[in-house]
Amino acid sequence: MRVLFIGDVFGQPGRRVLQNHLPTIRPQFDFVIVNMENSAGGFGMHRDAARGALEAGAGCLTLGNHAWHHKDIYPMLSEDTYPIVRPLNYADPGTPGVGWRTFDVNGEKLTVVNLLGRVFMEAVDNPFRTMDALLERDDLGTVFVDFHAEATSEKEAMGWHLAGRVAAVIGTHTHVPTADTRILKGGTAYQTDAGFTGPHDSIIGSAIEGPLQRFLTERPHRYGVAEGRAELNGVALHFEGGKATAAERYRFIED
């Protein structure tokens, strides 16, 4: 099973490069997962962004800590017709949507899970224990985990915690692709962060002036989505029998 995971789509430039580039490479993969956490102006995902990604060839959309920023997607989260997965480890049983979904990929089961980290982020249920509970099921097939977290240590800990128990643990949220792509013991693909899909000449997606002035003046400044050419980052994976046999960073930059 060949799976492409694409990191956090950021704003209109991220949506543009996704919708232009993904259709050209989609035939190379059996399934595509896209994190859409920042696709609507840098914060969350709205209905049009979701539809655009699905039309481009995405088979599943994941989210993160900005999942609730746009209320127009709340009904979509709870409809099986929309393959969207929000973070699993929210305590409230009335939280819209689901934290995992299982897909049929050419006759094989692929389960996509979305988790939130807790270090330097808002309080949510323990992602390690939440994942342990899910893995008590025996009907998940090949399991892919999008771990949306800030701290490298927490992401690495999750990778080792799930080594040999899932097919992949790929981090999102920090927007910079890391060079630690590998296969952990037991056949679990791991990368601390897939990187983002958005403006290339930016500060993790934002127009340079706002963040730069904040550092220079130590005062708040307005942030906006940067313009210009965009990049697309992700991880290309190969799974066999519920295990990863290959993992490679994927990167494309517009001319």
From Swiss-Prot:
Record: active site: 66 (proton donor)
GO terms, molecular function: 2',3'-cyclic-nucleotide 2'-phosphodiesterase activity; 2',3'-cyclic-nucleotide 3'-phosphodiesterase activity; metal ion binding; phosphoenolpyruvate phosphatase activity
Pfam families per UniProt: YmdB
UniProt xrefs under CDD domains: MPP_DR1281
Catalysed reaction, written as an equation: a nucleoside 2',3'-cyclic phosphate + H2O = a nucleoside 3'-phosphate + H(+); phosphoenolpyruvate + H2O = pyruvate + phosphate
UniProt: a divalent metal cation 1 binding residues: 8, 37-38, 175
InterPro entries, A to Z: Metallo-depent_PP-like, YmdB-like
Binding site for a divalent metal cation 2: 37, 65, 148, 173
SUPFAM superfamilies xref list: Metallo-dependent phosphatases
Cofactors, names only: Mn(2+); Co(2+); Fe(2+)
Activity sensitivity to pH: Optimum pH is 6.0-7.0.
EC assignment: 3.1.4.16, 3.1.3.60
EC category name: hydrolase
Gene3D superfamilies assigned to the protein according to its UniProt record, in alphabetical order: 3.60.21.10
Cofactor binding note: Mn(2+) is the preferable metal for phosphatase activity. Phosphodiesterase activity is observed in the presence of Co(2+), Mn(2+) or Fe(2+).
Keywords: Cobalt, Hydrolase, Iron, Manganese, Metal-binding
Cited PANTHER family: 2',3'-CYCLIC-NUCLEOTIDE 2'-PHOSPHODIESTERASE
Function, as annotated: Has a dual activity phosphatase/phosphodiesterase in vitro, with a preference to phosphoenolpyruvate (PEP) and 2',3'-cAMP, respectively. Can also use 2',3'-cGMP, 2',3'-cCMP and various model substrates such as p-nitrophenyl phosphate (pNPP), bis-p-nitrophenyl phosphate (bis-pNPP) and p-nitrophenyl thymidine monophosphate (pNP-TMP).
Family according to the record: Belongs to the YmdB-like family.
Protein name, as recorded: Phosphatase/phosphodiesterase DR_1281
Phylogenetic classification of the source organism: Bacteria, Thermotogati, Deinococcota, Deinococci, Deinococcales
